[in-house]
């Protein structure tokens, strides 16, 4: 691996006036540095000429006359393995690509001999980002001087604010319990299942949507918008390391030919519409855990963002809206981290909440102090939320063979050649894993997993995954692995829910429940006569498709085609209702394995005998 050592000579140039205009705004006090690259090969390193950006870099420079050494590692977990982007042509055509992102230019880092330091840097065109040194936050960005390597280093407090009014989160009701009860949350008696859930690393696959206002704000330049969002996600990823939560960008959509929903200055209205669009549209196109709308809309009052509380993994409510309220990407990332915190069960901090800084991430007033720490209250609330709700989607982690870039110890992703990876030595809190080598500590059999307890394999027969319902089986540890075995189900065709259905791949598919899922809690299955539409072979009634052609149902199969329901709402009189969307025509069909008659189930659009179906 080629390692780049860059020495920055710190000739502090004379100021060209009392202030300077940078991307971040007008800065009144700054230092000018001029990076000079010096390459060196470390012992054992292998040069990889196909890489444009090195995996590991060091920068040596001075701040206030004091020398510092900044160590950087490429953030290998910034993008998911199946990352994709979508934008729209002027005539509305959807354009989706899978850009190569493994050789990207976004880094995390630390300052040598400063245990509390951190950094998030873009090295795409010079150095742009922030680093924390001796408890103070500094920003660095290239100066736009022709044929020059000059950069500016400055502190947030030296930036002139265009809008001095503090920005707020739009969440109004926190229902925070007392300081005493917050402390007690960490003393809860946990079941083995809850403890295993807490010990398992979490992975949030985030989708970002940039609206048409953002597209226009940044000169209709897709490259500029991508770079901004990559920077924000790099910071978000860094922030959530504190919870051992890995945040990866799985999808980016830019509404380049107009917004897909109506946007309103009332943040709650925009969030409601965005969540519904997410469930109706985006969830059908891209598998992900959480969606954040980055908008150019100026919300009413001081509101800079709004997110649902305690809703991670929900198809509609695992979402938030964030205003692009500041030129500094770091502050926009803090707002997004705040709203994502709401999705993860955190509410606003009260006066008794502390994080060792002037302001914490979950303060109702968004921090401009450069702090990205979570308070003791936020940590306990997140812990309690995870214990009580155990959202399952964030347990799905990438396979070590799915990670296409070279392995790097310390990025919290277990890759080929590693036993474990608990993050950098400064973040690692796992006694079973050596953070410096990504190998198990002496005597340890495992570092994490549902069947790992205190660094040892759990004894054989210990339940690691309880039965979810009557069609599922409890799964047991083998005593030979830290991983819970593959999910095992009851046999297909076993009666369930008081003979209203038959088990199918671990669930009990029943028409009534499918209607409730599509039309709400009052919905019921429509009268038998409605299902006769399935004999027509049209959009609103068919059993299956062959070569794109809709095949009508035979008379005995009509209950295995389009699902007909009645939502039971007083204002609706149509007794034959269906769910139909041209983007996903098969959504709203009767699920496979659903009971269609006594002793019969739907398989491939036919109502067949349950004893021969499987």
UniProtKB/Swiss-Prot annotation:
<feature type="domain" description="Disintegrin">
    <location>
        <begin position="406"/>
        <end position="492"/>
    </location>
</feature>
<feature type="disulfide bond">
    <location>
        <begin position="464"/>
        <end position="484"/>
    </location>
</feature>
<feature type="binding site">
    <location>
        <position position="421"/>
    </location>
    <ligand>
        <name>Ca(2+)</name>
    </ligand>
</feature>
<feature type="binding site">
    <location>
        <position position="342"/>
    </location>
    <ligand>
        <name>Zn(2+)</name>
    </ligand>
</feature>
<dbReference type="InterPro" id="IPR002870">
    <property type="entry name" value="Peptidase_M12B_N"/>
</dbReference>
<keyword id="KW-0873">Pyrrolidone carboxylic acid</keyword>
<feature type="disulfide bond">
    <location>
        <begin position="422"/>
        <end position="428"/>
    </location>
</feature>
<dbReference type="GO" id="GO:0006508">
    <property type="term" value="P:proteolysis"/>
</dbReference>
<keyword id="KW-0964">Secreted</keyword>
<dbReference type="GO" id="GO:0090729">
    <property type="term" value="F:toxin activity"/>
</dbReference>
<feature type="propeptide">
    <location>
        <begin position="20"/>
        <end position="193"/>
    </location>
</feature>
<keyword id="KW-0053">Apoptosis</keyword>
<keyword id="KW-0645">Protease</keyword>
<dbReference type="InterPro" id="IPR034027">
    <property type="entry name" value="Reprolysin_adamalysin"/>
</dbReference>
<feature type="glycosylation site" description="N-linked (GlcNAc...) asparagine">
    <location>
        <position position="376"/>
    </location>
</feature>
<comment type="similarity">
    <text>Belongs to the venom metalloproteinase (M12B) family. P-III subfamily. P-IIIc sub-subfamily.</text>
</comment>
<keyword id="KW-1217">Cell adhesion impairing toxin</keyword>
<feature type="disulfide bond">
    <location>
        <begin position="355"/>
        <end position="360"/>
    </location>
</feature>
<feature type="disulfide bond">
    <location>
        <begin position="530"/>
        <end position="576"/>
    </location>
</feature>
<keyword id="KW-1199">Hemostasis impairing toxin</keyword>
<comment type="function">
    <text>This metalloproteinase hydrolyzes azocasein, and oxidized insulin B-chain. Also hydrolyzes the alpha-chain (FGA) and more slowly the beta-chain of fibrinogen (FGB), without affecting the gamma-chain. Does not cleave fibrin. Inhibits endothelial cell adhesion to extracellular matrix proteins such as fibrinogen, fibronectin, vitronectin, collagen I, and collagen IV. Induces apoptosis in vascular endothelial cells.</text>
</comment>
<comment type="subunit">
    <text>Heterodimer; disulfide-linked.</text>
</comment>
<dbReference type="Pfam" id="PF01562">
    <property type="entry name" value="Pep_M12B_propep"/>
</dbReference>
<feature type="domain" description="Peptidase M12B">
    <location>
        <begin position="202"/>
        <end position="398"/>
    </location>
</feature>
<dbReference type="InterPro" id="IPR006586">
    <property type="entry name" value="ADAM_Cys-rich"/>
</dbReference>
<feature type="disulfide bond">
    <location>
        <begin position="313"/>
        <end position="393"/>
    </location>
</feature>
<feature type="disulfide bond">
    <location>
        <begin position="596"/>
        <end position="607"/>
    </location>
</feature>
<dbReference type="InterPro" id="IPR036436">
    <property type="entry name" value="Disintegrin_dom_sf"/>
</dbReference>
<dbReference type="Pfam" id="PF08516">
    <property type="entry name" value="ADAM_CR"/>
</dbReference>
<feature type="disulfide bond">
    <location>
        <begin position="432"/>
        <end position="455"/>
    </location>
</feature>
<keyword id="KW-0325">Glycoprotein</keyword>
<feature type="disulfide bond">
    <location>
        <begin position="420"/>
        <end position="433"/>
    </location>
</feature>
<dbReference type="GO" id="GO:0005886">
    <property type="term" value="C:plasma membrane"/>
</dbReference>
<keyword id="KW-0479">Metal-binding</keyword>
<dbReference type="GO" id="GO:0006915">
    <property type="term" value="P:apoptotic process"/>
</dbReference>
<feature type="disulfide bond">
    <location>
        <begin position="496"/>
        <end position="508"/>
    </location>
</feature>
<feature type="disulfide bond">
    <location>
        <begin position="471"/>
        <end position="503"/>
    </location>
</feature>
<feature type="binding site">
    <location>
        <position position="415"/>
    </location>
    <ligand>
        <name>Ca(2+)</name>
    </ligand>
</feature>
<keyword id="KW-0482">Metalloprotease</keyword>
<dbReference type="GO" id="GO:0004222">
    <property type="term" value="F:metalloendopeptidase activity"/>
</dbReference>
<keyword id="KW-0865">Zymogen</keyword>
<feature type="disulfide bond">
    <location>
        <begin position="515"/>
        <end position="565"/>
    </location>
</feature>
């Amino acid at each position: 691996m080629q390692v780049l050592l860059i020495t920055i000579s710190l000739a502090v140039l004379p100021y060209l006036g009392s202030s300077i205009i940078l991307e971040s705004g007008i800065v009144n006090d700054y230092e000018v540095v001029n990076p000079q690259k010096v390459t060196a090969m470390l012992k054992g390193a292998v040069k990889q000429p196909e890489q444009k950006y090195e995996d590991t870099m060091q920068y040596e420079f001075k701040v206030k006359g004091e020398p510092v050494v900044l160590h950087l590692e490429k953030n290998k977990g910034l993008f998911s393995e199946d990352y994709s982007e979508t934008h729209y042509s002027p005539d509305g055509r959807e354009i989706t690509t899978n850009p190569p992102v493994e050789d990207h230019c976004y880094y995390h880092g630390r300052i040598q001999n400063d245990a509390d330091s951190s950094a998030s840097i873009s090295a795409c065109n010079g150095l742009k980002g922030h680093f924390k040194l001796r408890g103070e936050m500094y920003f660095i960005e290239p100066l736009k001087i022709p044929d020059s390597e000059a950069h500016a280093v400055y502190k947030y407090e030296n930036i002139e604010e265009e809008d001095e009014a503090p920005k707020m989160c739009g969440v109004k009701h926190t229902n925070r319990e007392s300081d005493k009860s917050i402390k007690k949350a960490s003393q809860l008696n946990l079941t083995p299942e809850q403890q295993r859930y807490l010990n398992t690393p979490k992975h949030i696959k985030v989708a970002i949507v940039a609206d048409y206002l953002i597209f226009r704000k940044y000169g209709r330049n897709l490259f500029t918008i991508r770079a901004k969002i990559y920077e924000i996600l790099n910071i978000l990823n860094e922030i959530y390391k504190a919870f051992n939560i890995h945040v990866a960008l799985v999808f980016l959509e830019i509404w380049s030919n107009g917004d897909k929903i109506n946007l309103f200055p009332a943040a709650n209205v925009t969030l409601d519409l965005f969540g519904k669009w997410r469930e109706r549209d985006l969830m059908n196109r891209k598998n992900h855990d959480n969606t954040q709308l980055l908008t150019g809309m100026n919300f009413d009052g001081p509101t800079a963002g709004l997110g649902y509380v305690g809703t991670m993994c929900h198809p509609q409510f695992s979402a938030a809206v964030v205003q692009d309220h500041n030129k500094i990407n770091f502050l926009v990332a803090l707002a997004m981290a705040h709203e994502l915190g709401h999705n993860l069960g955190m509410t606003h901090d009260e006066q008794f909440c502390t994080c060792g800084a002037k302001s914490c991430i979950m303060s109702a007033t968004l921090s401009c102090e450069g702090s990205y720490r979570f308070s003791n209250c936020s940590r306990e609330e997140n812990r309690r939320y995870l214990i009580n709700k155990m959202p399952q989607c964030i347990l799905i982690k990438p396979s070590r063979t799915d990670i296409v870039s070279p392995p790097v110890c310390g990025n919290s992703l277990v890759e080929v050649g590693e036993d474990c990876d608990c993050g950098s030595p400064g973040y690692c809190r796992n006694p079973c894993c050596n953070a410096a080598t990504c190998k198990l500590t002496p005597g340890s059999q495992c570092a994490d997993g549902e069947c790992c307890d205190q660094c040892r394999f759990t004894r054989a027969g210990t339940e690691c995954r309880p039965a979810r319902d009557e069609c599922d089986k409890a799964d047991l540890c083998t005593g030979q692995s830290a991983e819970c075995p593959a999910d095992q189900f009851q046999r297909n065709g076993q009666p369930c829910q008081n003979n209203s259905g038959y088990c199918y791949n671990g669930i009990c598919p029943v028409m009534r429940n499918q209607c409730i899922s599509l039309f709400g809690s009052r919905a019921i299955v429509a009268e038998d006569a409605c299902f006769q539409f399935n004999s027509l072979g049209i959009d609103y009634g068919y059993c299956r498709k062959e070569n794109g052609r809709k095949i009508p149902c035979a008379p005995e199969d009509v209950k295995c085609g389009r699902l007909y329901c009645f939502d039971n709402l007083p204002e609706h009189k149509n007794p034959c209702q269906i769910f139909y969307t041209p983007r996903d025509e098969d959504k709203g069909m009767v699920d496979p394995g659903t009971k269609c008659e006594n002793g019969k189930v739907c398989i491939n659009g036919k109502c067949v005998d349950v004893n021969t179906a499987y």
